[in-house]
């Protein structure tokens, strides 16, 4: 790879890092091409991307920018997962793949400039996704008026029954 190709690759990695809100550095030693292709497809479905790059090029690309905190993590065999949309979906995809594959391990990550450890990424994967959180919030917001109406119905119902009893007594 000549100098101009390296510069183009560095700028491409830098552009991906600048647009990504979530970046994960993984170790991938010994993984088969089939498994790697499967991981890339799953990450694409989740709104992410998985690249295997040379460490020196990755270090240069990550020298500045929001994810520069992970530039020292590029050692040995490593690859980068970029998350563009929802960090939780990317974390879940990577975490699920790590559980099934013995060849990939998570090293570190960066969520909008904050360094994440392997444990942090596992915890992030346990969180509900954005659509699930929206559904939970809407369910909670919907429960308030429903409970309010039920409360008033429970207050008025005995009064209604008493009035019906008085009306039946007067009619008889």
UniProtKB/Swiss-Prot annotation:
A matching Pfam family: Ribosomal_L10
GO biological process, one term: translation
InterPro entries per UniProt: Ribosomal_uL10, Ribosomal_uL10-like_sf, Ribosomal_uL10_bac, Ribosomal_uL10_bac_type, Ribosomal_uL10_CS_bac
GO molecular function, one term: structural constituent of ribosome
SUPFAM superfamilies in UniProt: Ribosomal protein L10-like (SSF160369)
UniProt KW keywords: Ribonucleoprotein, Ribosomal protein, RNA-binding, rRNA-binding
GO cellular component: large ribosomal subunit
CDD domains, per the entry: Ribosomal_L10 (cd05797)
Family: Belongs to the universal ribosomal protein uL10 family.
Quaternary structure, from the entry: Part of the ribosomal stalk of the 50S ribosomal subunit. The N-terminus interacts with L11 and the large rRNA to form the base of the stalk. The C-terminus forms an elongated spine to which L12 dimers bind in a sequential fashion forming a multimeric L10(L12)X complex.
Its job: Forms part of the ribosomal stalk, playing a central role in the interaction of the ribosome with GTP-bound translation factors.
Listed name of the protein: Large ribosomal subunit protein uL10
The organism of origin for this protein: Lawsonia intracellularis (strain PHE/MN1-00)
